[in-house]
Amino acid sequence: MNTEYMDYCFKSIKRRKKNIIKTSFTIFIVFAAVTLLILIRTNVYQWQLQSVKDRFGSWFVMMCGSDGKENSELKGHPYLKESGKAVKVNNVYDNGGEMTETGIGYMTEEFIRLGNISTEEGHFPQKDDEAAVDWNTLLELNQGSSLGQDIVIRTVISDENGQTEDITRTYKLAGILKSYTNSWAGGDRVPGVIVTEQAAKDIKRNNNAIYIYTVDDYVNDYEAIYDGLKKKTSSSLIYNSSVYEYEPWSGGNIYDYMYMIIVLVGIAGITYQLSVYSTGRKRVY
């Protein structure tokens, strides 16, 4: 081994020690910044996505069908996981006897969980004379928003002969739910006045049911899966685009700009160190 050459190399490195340290530190800072940005991007996206699911539900597709007749294609589909059901037994009628779009019915615990439906005040109905109402529906009813107050619901039921009868039910406002009827895709199909299953049966006129399904975690081509599901069912199928087409921060472009800025700063720092080193060499020689 040429010891003189090695000594020369070590002396050269020692002489340029400050420049080498500065350049290495600049490169380290750039890599650390990029790594930190990747971690921030992942965590922020997960936080934003969870916030969206809290508002619009964790469900993937919603099917409007009949109570007791869940679509077998969806129920046994390999890409779909859990399901929940809400039953709209009747429509609310206004004081003039006109039917409104507001529905009354009940929800299963699975539907409440998958829809991330929660109470802002109070609780879900526990007794047959209690009702929980989402905020949007409560505003439409225009009967007040104090827990424990009476909520008067007018509906129409039919007997076995097809004869209709106007009936009025009074419920105690047990809970106020965060709005979903005016924010979800297909939220207008979901009953906004929630009562117990038994109370719903007492005023049942319709046999309408809404089923929601979640998708497996490993699936990422959501739109293609949705298109495939539509071809397998003749029922009305609604896609939760608010969640599964969600793009945080303008589709992630802001992160691309941040990457570019960090890389440019790194290049500028390294270029500066090289220019300082080159100037130092000229002075020596």
Model-derived features: where do they sit?
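Alpha-helical scaffold elements within enzyme catalytic domains, especially in hydrolases
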Residues: 12, 73, 228, 276-279
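Alpha-helical architecture
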Residues: 14, 28, 120-121, 132, ...
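Hydrophobic alpha-helical transmembrane segments of multi-pass inner-membrane transport and secretion
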Residues: 18-46, 250-285
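Basic-flanked hydrophobic alpha-helices used for secretion and membrane insertion
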Residues: 42-248
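Cytoplasmic juxtamembrane interface segments
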Residues: 16, 194-202, 279-285
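Short amphipathic alpha-helical coupling elements at transmembrane boundaries
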Residues: 7, 11-15, 49-53
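Conserved acidic
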Residues: 1, 36, 167
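Short, membrane-interfacial amphipathic segments enriched in basic
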Residues: 1-7
